[in-house]
Amino acid sequence: MDLKFLDFEQPIAELEAKIEELRHVGFDNEINISEEISKLEEKSRKLTESVFSSLSAWQISQISRHPQRPHSRDYIDLIFQEFHELHGDRAFADDPAIIGGLARLDGAAVLVIGHQKGRDTKEKIHRNFGMPRPEGYRKALRLMRLAERFRLPIVCLIDTPGAYPGINAEERGQSEAIARNLFEMAQLQTPIVCVVIGEGGSGGALAIGVGDRLLMLQYSTYSVISPEGCASILWKSADKAELAAEAMGITSERLMELGLIDSIVPEPLGGAHRDRERMADNLKTELKRNLEELAALPMEELLAMRYERLMGYGVYEEPAT
């Protein structure tokens, strides 16, 4: 897979292009230039470390949307076994923007649910760019209730720019579907681990994001609105997106400081798309650890902690009158 580089990665891209050019020269002319290539590879690694050691919130936002970043289905295939997808909300339709089904995690039965964005143009349209409609959230809730009935732990993979704001979605009760999921997930009598793997966009993310543990991949984001949307509202221009990203505190590091997430899953150097297998291994380790810890807790304690966590989001104090 040919790597695609973001604008701020151009110095790295130029160095990688030189390395690739040398490889072709050596192969075509049967010249051993492995030593030169090794030196350039080490230089590229150090440059990547330097660039990624001081990323801005806006740059991290770009990485979270990288076109080659692994999606929910990628992690399902790499982490879980015997995945059997389930379809439909049993009320209106099946929404491809949400995928979910039964699977095994090293032998243990689980239910997995996630947003799915799509890769090429055809699939992106089919998946509605990862923006679920009401039937997607109702499908997710149907599967969660199934998991509760059979005492299966739930893993939710979050990666969406937000819930679909179209007229048809609103007519079918988009806000009710999201609110219903929040209400029901707070009471489900089974462990829930949620992971932001890319974009965590507003209520569209939170609708499958109420759980006992909330993890974020290192270069994922979680916010009430996109930086561009925030900039358009506050400064009347999407050009201020970089400023908005910094002000909103959308990164895993900032949210960890605020106590809104439980842990950060480290990504390979350069981002999850650079080494999907390694990223999946890192996430699998964290999922197993958290599920084992939650399985040891009494259900009453689990539900009380989950409710307290949900009520702690967005707390503010009104000034005395």
Swiss-Prot record:
Role description: Component of the acetyl coenzyme A carboxylase (ACC) complex. First, biotin carboxylase catalyzes the carboxylation of biotin on its carrier protein (BCCP) and then the CO(2) group is transferred by the carboxyltransferase to acetyl-CoA to form malonyl-CoA.
Gene label: accA
All copies of domain CoA carboxyltransferase C-terminal, residue ranges: 39-293
Species for this entry: Methylococcus capsulatus (strain ATCC 33009 / NCIMB 11132 / Bath)
Subunit structure: Acetyl-CoA carboxylase is a heterohexamer composed of biotin carboxyl carrier protein (AccB), biotin carboxylase (AccC) and two subunits each of ACCase subunit alpha (AccA) and ACCase subunit beta (AccD).
Reactions performed catalytically: N(6)-carboxybiotinyl-L-lysyl-[protein] + acetyl-CoA = N(6)-biotinyl-L-lysyl-[protein] + malonyl-CoA
Entry's Gene Ontology cellular component terms: acetyl-CoA carboxylase complex
Gene3D superfamilies in the cross-refs: 2-enoyl-CoA Hydratase, Chain A, domain 1
Intracellular or extracellular location(s): Cytoplasm
EC code(s) of this entry: 2.1.3.15
Name of the protein in its database record: Acetyl-coenzyme A carboxylase carboxyl transferase subunit alpha
EC main group: transferase
Keywords, ordered alphabetically: ATP-binding, Cytoplasm, Fatty acid biosynthesis, Fatty acid metabolism, Lipid biosynthesis, Lipid metabolism, Nucleotide-binding, Transferase
